[in-house]
Amino acid sequence: MKMGLAALIALLAGAAAAGEPCREMRHEGLRHVVCEARAGDDLRLFLNAPDGTPFGSFGRIDAALAAEGAALEFAMNAGMYHADRRPVGLYVEAGEEAARLVTSAGPGNFGMLPNGVFCIGQDGFAVIESRRFAEDRPACRHATQSGPMLLVAGEVHPRFIPGSTSRYLRNGVGVSPDGGTAYFVISRGRVNFDGFARFFRDALGVRDALYLDGNISRLHAPGLGRSDAGLPMGPVVGLVAPR
């Protein structure tokens, strides 16, 4: 079979990109970094180090993984937390629940219902509205609660305002309709909630997505030459691979 040069270049470029989980995408004039995990990947949540203190940084997590011959392919902050880095809502790590589910409305973004839970299951991923999660709780190897939901069944959160001037750096997670792919997104600039939600729906084809946080949002993506520093973090989600 003959293949044109342009087609061959495209094929090789796609093969090269397949090994890098993170890429930059543009939507409505704004840039976002998108990192993907697939069902079967070693995607984990991290909170406390073996000594019981919060990891707080990508570097400490990577150092702990080195002891098992592994490293972070990418990572980002994964939900809201108190001043001592305890999760605000549900937190499950390696099957152990460290913080309970919160289903009541409350102050701030977390309490802007509907909020939701990101679940890493045995066979894939899910983003589920918190009260629905409470009614029919799936088996989650890892789970983190945050808020607000960005998308519920393809619909933008009802309290988001198109054209809002409340623009911040933001990060979130969405799941493909078949549950086989999780998309972790961080904006490269300031974006409002409505625009961020529509990126998941219109650029990634996601129907359910969850906001993770705003100004403190950080990304570790060695393949992009990026590892953001800052104040100590609470929960972190990361894709783990052999060194």
Predicted stretch roles:
Residues 13-15:
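N-terminal signal peptide c-region/cleavage motif recognized by signal peptidases
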Residues 88-104, 159-170, 175-208, 217-243:
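Conserved, well-ordered active-site substructure
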Residues 17-109:
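Zymogen propeptides
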Residues 50-53, 132-136, 186-190:
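Short, solvent-exposed aromatic-acidic interface loops
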Residues 37-41, 119-124, 152-154, 175-180, ...:
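Short acidic-glycine loop/turn motifs at beta-strand connectors
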Residues 86-160:
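Active-site-adjacent helix-turn-beta-strand microarchitecture at beta-sheet edges
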Residues 26, 84, 212-220:
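Small/polar glycine-rich anion-binding or flexible loop at a beta-alpha turn
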Residues 1-8:
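Sec-dependent signal peptide recognition
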